[in-house]
């Protein structure tokens, strides 16, 4: 059996804590150029809402773009009646672009 990397251990630890809450999960994925966010219903295994800097064709400062993606995701979620989610930062530290996305989602009206 292969040993897990620190990245994988962190990802599983954070995700298992969030799944116990029973809330919808706001999951974040960060690449070198773009940031992606989606709200997932783990009970049904369905993505309800998604937004990304790639789909929105946003350019500029990556931190500010992440904030705009968070706002866009919150607007889509509120349109579907989703107000409360659990923030799944995955293996990433709550800092920089991940933090900016979370703040943008809060500004847009999501609670977590």
Curated annotation (Swiss-Prot):
<comment type="similarity">
    <text>Belongs to the universal ribosomal protein uL18 family.</text>
</comment>
<dbReference type="InterPro" id="IPR004389">
    <property type="entry name" value="Ribosomal_uL18_bac-type"/>
</dbReference>
<keyword id="KW-0687">Ribonucleoprotein</keyword>
<keyword id="KW-0694">RNA-binding</keyword>
<comment type="subunit">
    <text>Part of the 50S ribosomal subunit; part of the 5S rRNA/L5/L18/L25 subcomplex. Contacts the 5S and 23S rRNAs.</text>
</comment>
<dbReference type="GO" id="GO:0008097">
    <property type="term" value="F:5S rRNA binding"/>
</dbReference>
<dbReference type="GO" id="GO:0006412">
    <property type="term" value="P:translation"/>
</dbReference>
<keyword id="KW-0689">Ribosomal protein</keyword>
<protein>
    <recommendedName>
        <fullName>Large ribosomal subunit protein uL18</fullName>
    </recommendedName>
</protein>
<dbReference type="GO" id="GO:0003735">
    <property type="term" value="F:structural constituent of ribosome"/>
</dbReference>
<dbReference type="Pfam" id="PF00861">
    <property type="entry name" value="Ribosomal_L18p"/>
</dbReference>
<dbReference type="InterPro" id="IPR005484">
    <property type="entry name" value="Ribosomal_uL18_bac/euk"/>
</dbReference>
<keyword id="KW-0699">rRNA-binding</keyword>
<dbReference type="GO" id="GO:0022625">
    <property type="term" value="C:cytosolic large ribosomal subunit"/>
</dbReference>
<comment type="function">
    <text>This is one of the proteins that bind and probably mediate the attachment of the 5S RNA into the large ribosomal subunit, where it forms part of the central protuberance.</text>
</comment>
């Amino acid at each position: 059996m292969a040993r897990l990397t620190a990245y994988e251990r962190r990802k599983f630890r954070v995700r298992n804590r969030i799944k116990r809450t029973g809330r919808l999960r706001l999951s974040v994925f960060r690449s070198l150029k773009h940031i992606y966010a989606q709200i997932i219903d783990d009970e049904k295994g369905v993505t309800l809402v998604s937004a990304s800097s790639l789909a929105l064709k946003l350019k500029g400062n990556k931190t500010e773009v992440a904030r705009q993606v968070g706002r866009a995701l919150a607007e889509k979620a509120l349109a579907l009646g989703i107000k409360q989610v659990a923030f799944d930062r995955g293996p990433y530290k709550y800092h920089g672009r991940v933090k900016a996305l979370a703040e943008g989602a809060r500004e847009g009206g999501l609670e977590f």
